[in-house]
């Protein structure tokens, strides 16, 4: 199913409003290797962290008429560093910075968040493609950590007669890693 442009734009607007309503410069730790991150979510040796950003937005779900369950469609978030918008995060999953660089990744490891009933899982993703010449152009791994929110509503069930899609607010810390090559 193709994502409706309007739903994505609304989710990004929601992310911008959430960012304006609370300090986007919330404490973002400097290096996730020392912040209680499970070992299986650590990037391989030789990687160095090139960026850490706060993502604020929505996890978008569609109601599957056949199963009556919410199915994940895409993320739609704004990326912040030190309170400033630096980029966006969208389907792919892709992270794109205003410096013109972007990275798309695939999930390598998925670990439940400390509160899995309300917070989406923590992830280690491996880059599948890079573009541009900025910060994300050499990224090899992405971590999604310290998530809050984003879980499909109603225990994952939906009513196909009335529910079509929903954006569930979330925040996450994204750490980007590169071997520098």
Where are these regions (language model features)?
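Primary mode marks residue(s) on the alpha4-beta5-alpha5 output face of response regulator receiver
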Residues: 29-60, 67-181
